[in-house]
Regions:
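C-terminal scaffold of the Radical SAM
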Residues: 5, 13, 26-52, 56-268
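Short cysteine clusters
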Residues: 15-22
Length: 268
């Protein structure tokens, strides 16, 4: 029997501290007990739907919605093991996750490796000035060299992605340019350029000028724009987002996640 190809998303709409320039709907604050209960509820949801989706084959898995790494590493490992035991998952299905840089550490990496996470999208937002420290209660900027050249580079895989903001008032044109250049100088395989939201947002013309300059710099460095504002080294394009853009059905679990299946869209 031919299986129906789908992509899967686990939605974690949580963030430790929401920055003013973030337009996404997120739950602010770190509550370990709450997050664990959320994972247990998601596990029940996955189990309950498995039989009805037995004719589907998962081509890619995305852990997103917020900073997915705010979830305990062992809980994420539990969810991914459950998915592989209850669902048909393609052997080469990538697993990508949106992460706060501070969570790429010795406590979590063993669980991420066991979960076969293939790429970590680090929420940096800006490298000049460094902005990701606003995502947590501590300033983790001193860990940056350790993060990028330690665990991830030692992986010897194309496993590091960056998330950068464009169109932000407090980041000058030259600061944004420097941030993009840093992407080209580090072992980064994927880049998402996210539009700044809220009061910190530049007007459309200035924001577009930053995008145009980024496009030139990234193209010169060998990156390819495979979807709007998503850049990758050749062969490192994101299968999840490609599937979504090409109309592939989406199995989604978690708060505010939307599923697209057989022409119907439902939201949790």
């Amino acid at each position: 029997t031919t299986l129906h190809p789908v992509v899967m998303k686990l939605n974690f709409p949580f963030i430790t501290r929401k920055p003013s320039f973030c337009g996404r709907t997120l739950i602010e604050g770190h509550n370990t007990e709450l997050l664990h209960r959320y994972v247990l509820a998601m596990a029940l949801e996955l189990k309950a739907n498995a039989a009805d989706l037995a004719d589907c084959e998962v081509q890619a898995i995305r852990l997103g919605g917020g900073s997915a790494s705010i979830i305990n590493g062992s809980d994420l490992d539990h969810l991914l093991r459950l998915i592989r035991s209850c669902y048909h998952v393609a052997e080469d299905a990538p697993v990508t996750m949106r992460t706060c840089p501070a969570d790429i550490n010795g406590a979590n990496m063993p669980f991420y490796n066991r979960s076969h996470v293939t790429r970590y999208d680090l929420e940096l937002y800006s490298l000049e000035p460094l902005d990701f420290c606003t995502l947590d209660t501590l300033n983790y900027s001193e860990q940056m060299p350790y993060i990028t050249h330690g665990f991830l580079r030692a992986d010897r895989r194309d496993s590091m992605g960056f998330v950068l903001l464009y169109g932000k008032k407090t980041v000058s044109r030259w600061g944004f340019r420097h941030s993009v250049l840093e992407v080209t100088r580090r072992p980064v395989c994927h880049l998402l350029l996210q539009r700044c939201a809220g009061a910190d947002m530049l007007d459309d013309a200035e924001a577009q000028a930053q995008l145009d300059e980024a496009a030139q710099l990234l193209t010169e460095a060998g990156f390819v724009q495979y979807l709007p504002r998503r850049w990758a080294k050749p062969g490192c394009e994101d299968k999840f987002w490609q599937g979504v853009a090409n109309g592939m059905d989406v199995l989604a679990f978690g708060l505010s996640a939307y599923t697209r299946l057989d022409g119907m869209i439902t939201t949790n």
